[in-house]
Design a protein with these regions (language model features):
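Hydrophobic helical h-region of N-terminal Sec-dependent signal peptides
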Residues: 14-19
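Extracytosolic ligand-binding ectodomains
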Residues: 2, 27-426
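Bacterial N-terminal signal peptides that target proteins for export
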Residues: 2-13
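C-terminal motif of bacterial Sec signal peptides marking the signal peptidase cleavage site
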Residues: 21-25
């Protein structure tokens, strides 16, 4: 397998740091290598004989900025490390940055700009499934390649997307299995009103019913909704044993703070969340979220040598108060996996890179553990970790799968999912 050692790269990067700082346009900061939030490209972003240009496409403004900034920062960290270690195929990476502004239509427009006008070699971007689905036809029409870093609802596969976050069998399904094994039977489903939560809840409903459980309520909130009083009243009336939370962005802040105002804690209404990571805990407050559960593949507390190096590098670059998270780590992995695929291909050409990926041997010794791109569906083999939020603001693993889990985005290996006939929501 083609593997990259994070410890070796970190050591080499440290020894070359002074050299790297002298290189023009190496992608070391947003101001000198990418673009400003309004999309104005700096001079250093121009491609040349010694550089290769990539795109970063995330929400720097709007309701999703709370989550996507950390993902963008992790990508920049990976770019800086790779540049300090010699670059990719002898070229330094420069990045062009665009703001999706938490609007799917804006993501589509900015994706086309990166591909058609900026002529980037690849794009790292998106968070919500709505933004991913908005850009998917753009990448397919231009035969460009998107690296998508966030867990999602599955039911999708594209030759022009590499999915470095979890498929549903690597986050949602094992989390529900964990709760069922713990004796939870009455589930309340709460989500933002878009593709991921609605499809995720179709999956969860089928799984819970097949196991003899009950969904006692299902509610959705607009992405910019701030008043959760009516939804909280419905939760009180339903009296669930567990809330399954697929809210995204600032909705999580409003919901949990309003629950806290009613003195509801994890003791009264325990919650399993699929889009709350360390960054959101820092924003909402550990005093509010302690005791609640989450399901991911990585936490800042994950005990691997590669993660220790990653956390130290992230905090050194962005500040000791900053925290890492699963989506940030998956975004960081994506840059290294792209590097490995280009080096196997011997080219930045999209078709050559896709051909290299199809061999199923592109791996990275990531902070979460070794991840490998499945050559057929372009999702990653990943470990699964259930975590609990503690009062120090960190998330600690309470369960993990004994081995990494192969991706099954369409849940074809689960009889209850096949029988339910779950279909993607467009």
């Amino acid at each position: 397998m083609k593997k990259v050692s994070l410890r070796k790269i970190a050591a080499l990067a440290a020894s070359m740091a002074m050299f790297a700082m002298t290189l023009a346009g190496c992608g070391s900061t947003a101001s000198d290598s990418g673009t400003s939030a309004d999309g104005t490209t700096s001079a250093a972003a121009a491609s040349g004989d010694d550089t290769v240009k990539v795109g970063l496409l995330h929400s720097l403004t709007g309701s999703m900025a709370i989550s996507e900034k950390a993902v963008r920062d992790a990508e920049v960290l990976a770019i800086d490390e790779i540049n300090a270690a010699g670059g990719v195929l002898g070229k330094q990476i420069v990045y062009v940055e665009e703001d999706g502004a938490s609007e799917p239509s804006t993501f589509a427009t900015k994706a086309e700009k990166l591909i058609d006008s900026e002529k980037v070699a690849t794009v790292f971007g998106c968070w919500t499934s709505s933004s991913r689905k908005a850009v998917k036809p753009v990448f397919e029409d231009y035969n460009a390649l998107l690296w998508y870093p966030v867990q999602y609802e599955g039911m999708e596969q594209s030759p022009n997307i590499v999915y470095t976050g979890a498929a549903p069998n690597q986050q949602i399904v094992p989390a529900i299995e964990y709760l069922l094994d713990k004796g939870y039977k009455k589930f309340f489903l709460l989500g933002s009103d878009y593709v991921f939560p609605r499809t995720a809840n179709m999956i969860i409903t089928a799984q819970v019913k097949a196991a003899g459980g009950e969904v006692v309520g299902e509610e959705y909130a607009d992405m910019d909704q701030t008043d959760f009083a009516a939804i909280i009243s419905k939760i009180e009336a339903a009296q669930p044993e567990i809330i399954i939370n697929t809210l995204n962005g600032t909705g999580n802040v409003s919901f949990f703070k309003q629950m806290a105002e009613k003195n509801y804690t994890s003791a009264e209404y325990p919650t399993m969340s699929f889009s709350i990571a360390e960054e959101e805990v820092a924003t909402i407050g550990a005093d509010i979220l302690k005791g609640h559960m989450v399901s991911w593949n990585y936490y800042e507390t994950t005990d691997t040598p590669e993660n220790k190096a990653f956390v130290e590098a992230y905090k050194a670059k962005f500040g000791e108060s900053r925290v890492t998270s699963d989506p940030a780590e998956a975004a960081y992995d994506a840059v290294y996996l792209w590097k490995a695929a280009c080096e196997k291909a011997g080219s930045f050409d999209v078709d050559a890179v896709k051909e290299a990926i199809s061999g199923g041997d592109i791996s990275f010794n990531a902070p979460e553990g070794t991840v490998t791109i499945n050559g057929t569906n372009q999702h990653l083999t990943k470990p699964v970790r259930i975590g609990e939020i503690r009062d120090d603001g960190l998330i600690y693993e309470v369960y993990s799968t004994p081995t990494a889990v192969d991706p099954d985005p369409y849940l074809t290996t689960y009889d209850w999912a096949v029988e339910a006939g779950i279909q993607p929501i467009e």
